[in-house]
Amino acid sequence: MYLTTQGYRAGMPQLSLTGISENWILKECGQKHWDALASHGQRERPDFFDDVGRRSYAAFTAIRVRTAGFEKMRENDDFEIRTSLRRVGQARHFSRHELISRGEEHCSVSMSSTFVTRSEVGNNRSISRATLTSLAGEIADPPAEAAEMFALGKAVRNSDLGNREAISRELLLNLNTQYVSSCEFYPCPNGDFNGADLLYFASFQAFVDRAEWQTHKFKEPPVTTARDMFFYGNVNLGDSVLVRTIGKRIDKRGIAHWCHVLRASDGAKIADVITEKRWKNS
């Protein structure tokens, strides 16, 4: 297992109107996962190639965010992120990141990745799993949390609100299908794609939050308490994405929703995003 801790001071890049920026922490933890892969694999830098020499990247398959209140963090607050990573399969790794401030855990981010490559140069629709037989690092049993994420991801990918018995998370049993809606977005090359020319995983969270805001424009924006994201595909530059809300709950506790993220050009589902938020003062 690989372990590391890094200190921070909350500034404008780390903060949003609702406290710590979820988008920032996703990107930061994503980079820490990437760097940890190199260290765990006994490499000086995160350069990976598959068995036939193609550039390979760690693509996230599942991410879980749990918070104790992003809004508690303020400008100039000191905090640290504690990272652990283990290899749980031939090309699969699992990491957990804990944001700690003043001895209190404010957020945890759990991430599962596998290595992928393109079978066609420049075509993000040709992304497939990569084989890296020479990858270093001991393989360990996945922790219970990882197993839970794998199981929920499998159930979510193959189910919908009409087949709720296949879904284990209690939230999904309370969503109402009368709120079905869609928002379309064109990913921007300057902000939504990463240096590997792939639609960045953190952009999926951003699209879902934009769809929520575009629909509701709450006077007091709610604060994320839990989010689960499962990724299945990517898009090419020029493709648009549809965020289709297939179930939603709005009550005195806050708002919750399950969104399919679809590639508009062929209708393929490229992600599921399940979100819970609470009202800021509740």
Descriptions of predicted regions:
Residues 1-82, 88, 208, 212, ...:
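Hydrophobic, proline/glycine-rich low-complexity stretches
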Residues 70-155, 235-237, 247-282:
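HotDog/MaoC-like acyl-thioester-processing domains
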Residues 4, 80-83, 227, 242-245:
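Generic structural motif
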Residues 9, 28, 33-50, 95-123, ...:
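Binding-site signature for planar aromatic cofactors or substrates
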Residues 63, 225-229, 273:
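Generic beta-strand hydrophobic packing signal
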Residues 53-58, 104, 178, 222, ...:
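A generic structural signal for short, non-catalytic loop/turn and secondary-structure boundary residues
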Residues 166-244, 250-256:
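Acidic/His-leaning functional-site neighborhoods
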Residues 1-24, 91, 116-193:
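Non-catalytic linker/capping segments at the edges of enzyme domains
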